[in-house]
């Protein structure tokens, strides 16, 4: 991997991780279309660290409040809306964690292909359009219930299918349940913290148990670039989502998926 490839892939990871357009698709496509070699386990860990740091630092006040309330609910049996939301985020993490443990190898072998990415990019883009068009946009994240959180957790589990988009499918599910765009995005981003932590820890453990050589310069590039791009992306997405809606991302997904289908048909 060259420094240009590291910069480009980290930039892609940062910008696409929290937009409803699928980060996995954008990381798979350069190798499929440009013939780049796989970025490797160490680089995967690096960009996970960068994007996780971005969302934790951006939501640092909310994270501290939720963690404090969550610990208080365990230690002091104190329950409030913050502790309730924290427990619901934990609940929403369980389906994806179980799905990952059970089906990760199957997905890696059979679904990590450009054809699957093209199909899911278009299908889930159209689903996002339909749901956003018909959404009531009335609830905030503190009106979350355990049934709604579990529904969002199942949606997050589906995001393991390449091209689906974790933020895309969870925001789609939240809009379907009647949440505002801002609340849907905030809960989706907060949901990402435990699942990215689990995924990064799993990859880090695999890396520690392997004999893979580590290039600190490339890894530093991955962490820094993915952090900066993810932080910027979160900031502007939350500021603009209410006014612009989901249509720009729907159009992008349809164009990307259609272009990929044409490219595959010609090759």
Curated annotation (Swiss-Prot):
Transmembrane segments: 1-21, 39-59, 83-103, 111-131, 149-169, 189-209, 218-238, 246-266
InterPro entries cross-referenced by the UniProt entry: UppP
Compartments it resides in: Cell inner membrane
Primary site of residence: membrane
Catalytic activity: di-trans,octa-cis-undecaprenyl diphosphate + H2O = di-trans,octa-cis-undecaprenyl phosphate + phosphate + H(+)
Enzyme class: hydrolase
One example of a Gene Ontology biological process annotation: response to antibiotic
Pfam families listed in its UniProt record: BacA
Domain of life: Bacteria
GO molecular function (one): undecaprenyl-diphosphatase activity
EC number: 3.6.1.27
Membrane topology according to the record: Multi-pass membrane protein
Keywords: Antibiotic resistance, Cell inner membrane, Cell membrane, Cell shape, Cell wall biogenesis/degradation, Hydrolase, Membrane, Peptidoglycan synthesis, Transmembrane, Transmembrane helix
GO-annotated cellular components: plasma membrane
HAMAP family: Undec_diphosphatase
Similarity section: Belongs to the UppP family.
Name of the protein in its database record: Undecaprenyl-diphosphatase
Originating species: Aliivibrio fischeri (strain ATCC 700601 / ES114)
């Amino acid at each position: 991997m060259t420094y240009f490839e590291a910069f480009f892939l980290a930039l892609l990871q940062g910008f696409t991780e929290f937009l409803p357009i699928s980060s996995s698709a954008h990381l798979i496509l350069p190798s499929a279309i440009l013939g780049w070699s796989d970025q490797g386990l160490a680089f995967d860990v690096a960009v996970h660290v960068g994007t996780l740091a971005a969302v934790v630092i951006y939501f640092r006040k909310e994270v501290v409040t939720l963690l404090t309330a969550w610990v208080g609910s365990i230690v002091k049996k104190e329950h409030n809306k913050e502790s309730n939301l924290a427990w619901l985020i934990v609940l929403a993490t369980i389906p994806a964690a179980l799905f990952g443990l059970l089906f990760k190898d199957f997905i890696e072998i059979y679904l990590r292909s450009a054809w699957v990415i093209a199909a899911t990019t278009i299908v889930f883009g159209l689903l996002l359009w339909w749901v956003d068009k018909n959404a009531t946009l009335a609830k905030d994240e503190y009106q979350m219930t355990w049934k709604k959180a579990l529904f969002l957790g199942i949606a997050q589990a589906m995001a393991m299918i390449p091209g689906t988009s974790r933020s895309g499918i969870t925001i789609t599910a939240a809009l379907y349940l009647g949440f505002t765009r801002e609340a849907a995005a905030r809960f989706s981003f907060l949901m990402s913290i435990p699942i990215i932590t689990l995924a990064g820890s799993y990859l880090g453990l695999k890396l520690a148990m392997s004999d893979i050589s580590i290039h600190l310069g490339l890894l530093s590039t991955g962490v820094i670039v993915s952090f900066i791009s993810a932080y910027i992306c979160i900031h502007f997405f939350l500021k603009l989502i209410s006014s612009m809606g989901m249509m720009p991302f729907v159009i992008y997904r349809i164009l990307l998926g259609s272009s990929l289908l044409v490219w595959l048909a010609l090759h």
